[in-house]
Amino acid sequence: MNIDDIKIAIVIPARLESSRLKQKMLIKFDGEPLIRLVYDKCRLMGYDTYVVTDSEEIAKHITIGNAIMTGDCENGTARIASVLDKFKEYDIIVNVQGDMLDITKKTLDPVLRDCVHNDVTTCYTKGCKPNDVKVIHQEGHALWFTRAPVGYGDRHLGIYAYRPHILRSYDLFDDEYPQERLEQNRILGHYNIQVVETTYDGVEINTEQDLF
């Protein structure tokens, strides 16, 4: 099977009350809210693209029919899993973070090529800063994800390509590292998470410092 034989949906989870930067999905860049810019960039890659959100305020900025309302959810993966029945026609569901302002097809393609052959794939760029989420990996497999300034690992990017059965089981998985509060750690111990290197030259909008 190759990437041309599978049906892919990009799904962007977006909550209104973000914890570190208030209502960041609605912050405007060049006159457009962040969520709309990320949505448009993904949509223009040629993939069916959706936003799953708890906010009518966010939903109104998205093409009619492509915003799906959810209840309260603990993280983005859980938000997608809560409305999985909306994506029955797709072979792969790609979770792209709504704060990835500079997302490009060049960033996404290595993840998609890998996930054709695997259950879960995510990605990294070489090197990391102390405040980055880090992935420690070996031979293409994730061993651990952490926010801690451990002094090693690579910068983890918030992109995940899932086979639907992973999302179907997500709420049943125990989180072996609850102190990290990282959604992907819940999958570790149940399934291998493949990691691939990619390129991402932009920012992720997480704090006020990222706005300048």
Where are each of the predicted segments found?
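N-terminal glycine-rich phosphate-binding loop and ensuing alpha1 helix
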Residues: 3-53
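Conserved alpha/beta core of the MobA/IspD/sugar-nucleotide pyrophosphorylase nucleotidyltransferase superfamily
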Residues: 6, 153-212
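Glycine-rich phosphate-binding loop signature in dinucleotide/nucleotide-binding domains
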Residues: 4, 86-91, 115-117
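Short, hydrophobic beta-strand segments that form beta-sheet elements in well-ordered domains
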Residues: 48-54, 121-123, 187
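Residues at the starts of beta-strands that form the adenosine-phosphate
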Residues: 7, 47-49, 91, 119, ...
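Conserved core of the sugar-phosphate nucleotidyltransferase
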Residues: 103-176
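Short phosphate-binding loop-to-helix
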Residues: 56-110
